[in-house]
Amino acid sequence: MITCLRNWPLLLKRFSVHQIHQFTQLSGRFERPPQSGKSSRDPYLVTVVQGRSKKPRFPGERSNQRFGEDSWFVSSTPLAEVMGVADGVGGWRDLGVDAGRFAKELMSCCSGQTQLSDFDGRSPRNMLIAGFQELSHREHPVVGSSTACLATMHRKDCTLYTANLGDSGFLVVRNGRVLHRSVEQTHDFNTPYQLTVPPEDRKESYYCDKPEMAVSTRHSLLPGDLVLLATDGLFDNMPESMLLSILNGLKERGEHDLLVGASRVVEKARELSMNASFQSPFAIKARQHNVSYSGGGKPDDITLILSSVEVPNA
């Protein structure tokens, strides 16, 4: 059976990246946007987005809300702050498919759910289910597959709700320590759970995971907590201790300081991904699964959404 799982032998092959395209988008417009129904006392998120493509943009790629084959979105409603990341599965390139387009369209469909009148932000898994259903039932479906991680902060109870499918993920950092971290969902080494829309004439040849398989969690948040969403390009290359070291160096939690911190994280992860001698988390996992790998980082697209929980001044 042909599966839609990531083609990991391709990823294990070392290759040289001569040019890295960088696209940075400040997300200050997501900070305390004016919304009817939102109390001035409600907590809110200060959010920035940063990322790197592993290769220069190819013709036709839209850089907006994409870093290579990764995609992301950030949205705000009267009841919740919402964000998501998705990692398009690169194996589709062998079939001439833009692997990042599926991730982009999936995030667009999920983001669209936040505009519905009954959206309350407490079930990102339902948002993922509805978004994927919309994408897969289009008259002309977008072929491809992707991991997905969605998170919402509900304003009234200051609670983080998450849904994660695959090996993208999230962290909650409080007082310099990781309070919560998502768990990867994989079928085998470097073969994550993923949502898939196969070609119409080959549906029977593909095994596809379902959005209902996403792991849902909820976590109470406090002012000053950091919430981080990222694709595996970050987690496969940067140890948690190194990530914490950079985040703990933030002196303030304003938009500028968060952007500086996010940029440092992404740049360090990119540097490590190109280091052939670094014992990256990816290299360690390969060894644990008895997979032949020479060591070093894993060149990949990197997407990071970094948020700080804040409350209005009295």
Swiss-Prot record:
<feature type="binding site">
    <location>
        <position position="87"/>
    </location>
    <ligand>
        <name>Mn(2+) 1</name>
    </ligand>
</feature>
<dbReference type="GO" id="GO:0004722">
    <property type="term" value="F:protein serine/threonine phosphatase activity"/>
</dbReference>
<dbReference type="InterPro" id="IPR036457">
    <property type="entry name" value="PPM-type-like_dom_sf"/>
</dbReference>
<dbReference type="InterPro" id="IPR001932">
    <property type="entry name" value="PPM-type_phosphatase-like_dom"/>
</dbReference>
<protein>
    <recommendedName>
        <fullName>Protein phosphatase PTC7 homolog fig</fullName>
        <ecNumber>3.1.3.16</ecNumber>
    </recommendedName>
</protein>
<dbReference type="GO" id="GO:0004721">
    <property type="term" value="F:phosphoprotein phosphatase activity"/>
</dbReference>
<keyword id="KW-0464">Manganese</keyword>
<keyword id="KW-0904">Protein phosphatase</keyword>
<dbReference type="GO" id="GO:0010795">
    <property type="term" value="P:regulation of ubiquinone biosynthetic process"/>
</dbReference>
<dbReference type="GO" id="GO:0005739">
    <property type="term" value="C:mitochondrion"/>
</dbReference>
<comment type="similarity">
    <text>Belongs to the PP2C family.</text>
</comment>
<dbReference type="GO" id="GO:0005759">
    <property type="term" value="C:mitochondrial matrix"/>
</dbReference>
<feature type="domain" description="PPM-type phosphatase">
    <location>
        <begin position="43"/>
        <end position="309"/>
    </location>
</feature>
<dbReference type="GO" id="GO:1904775">
    <property type="term" value="P:positive regulation of ubiquinone biosynthetic process"/>
</dbReference>
<keyword id="KW-0378">Hydrolase</keyword>
<dbReference type="GO" id="GO:0046872">
    <property type="term" value="F:metal ion binding"/>
</dbReference>
<feature type="binding site">
    <location>
        <position position="232"/>
    </location>
    <ligand>
        <name>Mn(2+) 2</name>
    </ligand>
</feature>
<keyword id="KW-0460">Magnesium</keyword>
<dbReference type="InterPro" id="IPR039123">
    <property type="entry name" value="PPTC7"/>
</dbReference>
<dbReference type="Pfam" id="PF13672">
    <property type="entry name" value="PP2C_2"/>
</dbReference>
<keyword id="KW-0479">Metal-binding</keyword>
<feature type="binding site">
    <location>
        <position position="87"/>
    </location>
    <ligand>
        <name>Mn(2+) 2</name>
    </ligand>
</feature>
<feature type="binding site">
    <location>
        <position position="88"/>
    </location>
    <ligand>
        <name>Mn(2+) 1</name>
    </ligand>
</feature>
